[in-house]
Amino acid sequence: MIKNKILAPKLYKENYKENFIEIEDFGDETIFKLLRKRGSNKINLYKKSIDLLIEIQKIKKKIIKNLKGKKYQVPIYENNKLFKEAKLFSDWYAKKYISKKKLPMVNIEINRQIKFLLSNLKIKNETLVHRDFHVSNLIRHKKKLAIIDTQDALIGNMAYDLASLIDDVRFKSNKKLKDNIYNYYLKISNDKINKIILLNDFEILSVIRNMKIIGIFARLAESCLLYTSPSPRDGLLSRMPSS
């Protein structure tokens, strides 16, 4: 990211054996916090986020060097991985509301529908995808916009990060704002983009991503990490995606 003039944390130290790295601290002035401020210019904040996304998507290098100077090829965000992520919905969330008797057949149908959606993706996997491009990972630092949590980036569909930002579960936004953000992306991105295909993939990947998030929240709730009230269900539902 940094070599491509993207403001991202510098890596200072590492200990791969102990799963430890030390990175630059950008503070906590996230776009999420700025959006929640009274009188904030929401569309301007989102436009700046889209500007950054466009710059990230211009990165074409697929082989990079890690901290040890070893070459590392960024993996492809294949449909198989997308399926496994979306399947978290049936693995963890569906079982909370479907009887044990019906659950096997329900899960079969859910997984069938996931595969159907993925089979209808049209855009080639040739864009750097952050995978968590949302308002909590975007930080204003020294009057510039920075991106954090970049370690899981893959080469995938250009619509994925766009869906992550616009249909973000962390910040509720109305349809008008969502449409304005989406149209701004179309305006400043590559003119060769097929608008029909982009919208198709955007909608599919938004569903897939939110299924993954619901599954993750359900799994965390089961392990008592998301309880915000005496009722586990209340704690879970308070964080259910709103998009």
Give, region by region, the residue ranges found by the protein language model.
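Active-site acidic catalytic loop and adjacent metal/ATP-binding pocket
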Residues: 56-57, 115-162, 169-176
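Active-site activation/catalytic loop segments of kinase-like enzymes and analogous catalytic loops
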Residues: 87-97, 158-193, 204-223
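A general structural signal marking secondary-structure boundaries and capping sites
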Residues: 5, 53-67, 93-97, 121, ...
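Short, polar/flexible loop-turn hinges at active-site or ligand-entry regions and domain interfaces
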Residues: 31-43, 97-102, 171-173, 222-226
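An alpha-helical support segment within catalytic cores of ATP-dependent transferases
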Residues: 61, 65-73, 80-81, 85-128, ...
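ATP-binding pocket architecture of kinase catalytic cores
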Residues: 1-84, 122
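All-alpha amphipathic helical-bundle segments outside canonical DNA-binding/catalytic cores
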Residues: 74-77, 195-206
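Single conserved hydrophobic/aromatic residue that forms the stacking wall/gate
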Residues: 227-243
